[in-house]
Protein backbone atom coordinates (compact mmCIF):
# COMPACT_ATOMS: atom_id res chain seq x y z
CA UNK A 1 0.00 0.00 0.00
CA UNK A 2 2.78 2.48 0.92
CA UNK A 3 4.61 1.70 -2.32
CA UNK A 4 1.45 2.51 -4.28
CA UNK A 5 1.14 5.86 -2.48
CA UNK A 6 4.84 6.61 -3.05
CA UNK A 7 4.40 5.74 -6.73
CA UNK A 8 1.41 8.10 -6.89
CA UNK A 9 3.59 10.86 -5.40
CA UNK A 10 6.40 10.16 -7.89
CA UNK A 11 3.92 10.27 -10.79
CA UNK A 12 2.51 13.55 -9.48
CA UNK A 13 6.00 15.06 -9.28
CA UNK A 14 6.85 13.89 -12.80
CA UNK A 15 3.62 15.44 -14.11
CA UNK A 16 4.54 18.72 -12.37
CA UNK A 17 7.99 18.65 -13.96
CA UNK A 18 9.66 18.38 -10.55
CA UNK A 19 12.63 16.14 -9.74
CA UNK A 20 11.23 12.79 -8.60
CA UNK A 21 14.09 12.08 -6.17
CA UNK A 22 12.76 11.28 -2.70
CA UNK A 23 14.34 11.95 0.71
CA UNK A 24 12.81 10.35 3.80
CA UNK A 25 9.67 9.58 1.78
CA UNK A 26 9.21 13.20 0.67
CA UNK A 27 10.18 15.02 -2.51
CA UNK A 28 13.79 16.25 -2.38
CA UNK A 29 12.44 19.64 -3.48
CA UNK A 30 10.73 19.95 -0.09
CA UNK A 31 14.13 20.18 1.58
CA UNK A 32 15.31 22.83 -0.88
CA UNK A 33 12.23 24.86 0.09
CA UNK A 34 12.87 24.04 3.78
CA UNK A 35 16.39 25.52 3.71
CA UNK A 36 15.41 28.43 1.47
CA UNK A 37 12.66 29.45 3.87
CA UNK A 38 14.85 28.78 6.90
CA UNK A 39 17.51 31.22 5.68
CA UNK A 40 14.91 33.77 4.61
CA UNK A 41 13.38 33.70 8.10
CA UNK A 42 16.87 33.85 9.64
CA UNK A 43 17.47 36.98 7.58
CA UNK A 44 14.11 38.55 8.46
CA UNK A 45 14.09 37.89 12.20
CA UNK A 46 17.81 38.56 12.52
CA UNK A 47 17.41 41.97 10.91
CA UNK A 48 14.34 42.68 13.03
CA UNK A 49 16.31 41.85 16.17
CA UNK A 50 18.92 44.42 15.21
CA UNK A 51 16.73 47.15 13.70
CA UNK A 52 15.54 49.01 16.78
CA UNK A 53 18.80 48.35 18.64
CA UNK A 54 20.68 50.02 15.79
CA UNK A 55 18.27 52.95 15.60
CA UNK A 56 18.36 53.78 19.34
CA UNK A 57 22.10 53.21 19.83
CA UNK A 58 24.03 56.45 20.32
CA UNK A 59 25.69 57.96 17.27
CA UNK A 60 29.07 57.71 19.01
CA UNK A 61 28.57 53.92 19.11
CA UNK A 62 27.70 53.57 15.40
CA UNK A 63 23.92 53.90 15.84
CA UNK A 64 21.57 56.64 14.77
CA UNK A 65 20.60 57.89 18.24
CA UNK A 66 16.85 57.85 17.66
CA UNK A 67 14.32 58.00 20.47
CA UNK A 68 12.60 54.75 21.43
CA UNK A 69 9.31 56.14 20.13
CA UNK A 70 10.70 57.00 16.69
CA UNK A 71 12.48 53.65 16.39
CA UNK A 72 9.34 51.74 17.35
CA UNK A 73 7.27 53.76 14.88
CA UNK A 74 9.57 52.80 12.01
CA UNK A 75 9.59 49.20 13.27
CA UNK A 76 5.78 49.16 13.33
CA UNK A 77 5.53 50.51 9.78
CA UNK A 78 8.12 48.02 8.55
CA UNK A 79 6.43 45.05 10.23
CA UNK A 80 2.96 46.11 9.11
CA UNK A 81 4.04 46.46 5.49
CA UNK A 82 5.88 43.13 5.62
CA UNK A 83 2.57 41.49 6.53
CA UNK A 84 0.52 43.51 4.00
CA UNK A 85 2.62 43.09 0.86
CA UNK A 86 2.23 39.28 0.57
CA UNK A 87 -1.42 39.90 -0.34
CA UNK A 88 -0.23 41.81 -3.39
CA UNK A 89 2.65 39.40 -4.05
CA UNK A 90 0.29 36.45 -4.13
CA UNK A 91 -1.93 38.18 -6.67
CA UNK A 92 1.08 39.08 -8.83
CA UNK A 93 2.18 35.43 -8.85
CA UNK A 94 -1.34 34.21 -9.61
CA UNK A 95 -1.95 36.65 -12.46
CA UNK A 96 1.48 37.43 -13.92
CA UNK A 97 4.63 35.61 -12.91
CA UNK A 98 3.79 32.24 -11.39
CA UNK A 99 5.13 31.02 -8.05
CA UNK A 100 8.67 30.21 -9.08
CA UNK A 101 9.44 33.53 -10.75
CA UNK A 102 7.85 35.45 -7.88
CA UNK A 103 10.00 33.58 -5.35
CA UNK A 104 13.20 34.16 -7.33
CA UNK A 105 12.40 37.83 -7.91
CA UNK A 106 11.45 38.29 -4.25
CA UNK A 107 14.68 36.64 -3.08
CA UNK A 108 16.73 38.83 -5.43
CA UNK A 109 14.98 42.00 -4.24
CA UNK A 110 15.50 41.04 -0.57
CA UNK A 111 19.18 40.35 -1.26
CA UNK A 112 19.50 43.81 -2.81
CA UNK A 113 17.75 45.19 0.27
CA UNK A 114 20.28 43.61 2.61
CA UNK A 115 23.13 44.84 0.42
CA UNK A 116 21.69 48.35 0.44
CA UNK A 117 21.38 48.31 4.22
CA UNK A 118 25.02 47.23 4.47
CA UNK A 119 25.94 50.45 2.63
CA UNK A 120 24.14 52.58 5.24
CA UNK A 121 27.47 54.01 6.41
CA UNK A 122 27.89 55.87 3.13
CA UNK A 123 24.41 57.41 3.08
CA UNK A 124 21.31 57.03 5.24
CA UNK A 125 19.17 56.78 2.11
CA UNK A 126 20.67 53.30 1.51
CA UNK A 127 19.08 52.21 4.79
CA UNK A 128 15.61 53.35 3.74
CA UNK A 129 15.98 51.94 0.23
CA UNK A 130 17.06 48.66 1.84
CA UNK A 131 13.97 48.55 4.05
CA UNK A 132 11.69 49.21 1.07
CA UNK A 133 13.42 46.50 -0.96
CA UNK A 134 13.11 44.05 1.94
CA UNK A 135 9.38 44.79 2.20
CA UNK A 136 8.77 44.40 -1.55
CA UNK A 137 10.88 41.26 -1.84
CA UNK A 138 9.12 39.68 1.11
CA UNK A 139 5.78 40.44 -0.53
CA UNK A 140 6.72 38.38 -3.56
CA UNK A 141 8.57 35.64 -1.71
CA UNK A 142 6.52 34.79 1.35
CA UNK A 143 3.09 33.77 0.01
CA UNK A 144 4.46 31.85 -2.93
CA UNK A 145 7.00 29.54 -1.33
CA UNK A 146 4.28 27.99 0.85
CA UNK A 147 2.18 27.43 -2.26
CA UNK A 148 5.05 25.53 -3.86
CA UNK A 149 5.07 23.08 -0.94
CA UNK A 150 1.43 22.29 -1.62
CA UNK A 151 2.14 21.70 -5.31
CA UNK A 152 4.65 18.97 -4.46
CA UNK A 153 1.89 16.62 -3.30
CA UNK A 154 -1.33 15.33 -4.85
CA UNK A 155 -4.42 16.61 -3.05
CA UNK A 156 -5.15 13.11 -1.74
CA UNK A 157 -1.64 12.49 -0.38
CA UNK A 158 -1.44 11.64 3.31
CA UNK A 159 2.14 12.98 3.23
CA UNK A 160 1.06 16.53 2.42
CA UNK A 161 0.44 17.43 6.08
CA UNK A 162 3.81 15.97 7.07
CA UNK A 163 5.45 17.95 4.26
CA UNK A 164 4.00 21.19 5.61
CA UNK A 165 5.15 20.22 9.12
CA UNK A 166 8.71 19.73 7.88
CA UNK A 167 8.53 23.04 5.98
CA UNK A 168 7.27 24.93 9.04
CA UNK A 169 10.08 23.43 11.11
CA UNK A 170 12.42 25.27 8.72
CA UNK A 171 10.52 28.52 9.26
CA UNK A 172 10.66 28.20 13.03
CA UNK A 173 14.31 27.13 13.06
CA UNK A 174 15.31 30.12 10.95
CA UNK A 175 13.31 32.54 13.09
CA UNK A 176 14.75 31.16 16.33
CA UNK A 177 18.35 31.13 15.10
CA UNK A 178 18.02 34.57 13.48
CA UNK A 179 16.83 36.25 16.66
CA UNK A 180 19.24 34.35 18.86
CA UNK A 181 22.43 34.70 16.84
CA UNK A 182 21.90 38.14 15.32
CA UNK A 183 20.70 39.56 18.62
CA UNK A 184 23.77 38.13 20.34
CA UNK A 185 26.15 39.37 17.64
CA UNK A 186 24.48 42.79 17.64
CA UNK A 187 25.09 43.27 21.33
Which residues make up each language-model segment?
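Cytosolic juxtamembrane N-terminal segment immediately preceding the first transmembrane helix
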Residues: 1-45
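Short amphipathic helix-loop junctions that connect adjacent transmembrane helices
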Residues: 49-72
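Central cavity-lining transmembrane alpha-helices of secondary-active solute carriers
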Residues: 72-94, 142, 176
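Glycine-rich segments within core transmembrane alpha-helices of 12-TM secondary carriers
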Residues: 82, 161-187
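Cytoplasmic membrane-interface "Motif A"-like loop-to-helix N-cap segments
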Residues: 95-107, 156
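C-terminal ends and interior cores of transmembrane alpha-helices
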Residues: 105-125
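Hydrophobic core of transmembrane alpha-helices in multi-pass small-molecule transporters
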Residues: 113, 124-141
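Intracellular juxtamembrane helix-capping segments at the cytosolic ends
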Residues: 140-154
Amino acid sequence: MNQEKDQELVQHLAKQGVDVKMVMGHPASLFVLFFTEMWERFSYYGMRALLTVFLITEISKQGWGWSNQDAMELYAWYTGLVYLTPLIGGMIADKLTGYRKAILLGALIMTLGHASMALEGTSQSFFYVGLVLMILGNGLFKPNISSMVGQLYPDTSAKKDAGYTIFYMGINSGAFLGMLLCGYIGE
